[in-house]
């Protein structure tokens, strides 16, 4: 996969090398000047795109702030299952908004 660093000895995703974002993200985003929705999946993407040091929980708590152009999402990992169970608003509020926004853009 594009800039995927591989797995640790325990089978977890390794963090992306900083060179990936420095080398590719601005160049890739420039290819899509009419991009209407960016899904920031995981803390690394959120920190880079939002230029923040906030935790995943802090960023996710402010998910409405950058709508309709940006929507942060947790990394799809078993490690986030506990977070998802504690933050029921994610499934109740954020996911329906994501579905609505994608449908809107698909028209």
Regions found by a protein language model. Name each.
Residues 1-107:
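Glycine/proline-rich loop-helix segments at beta-alpha junctions forming the active-site rim
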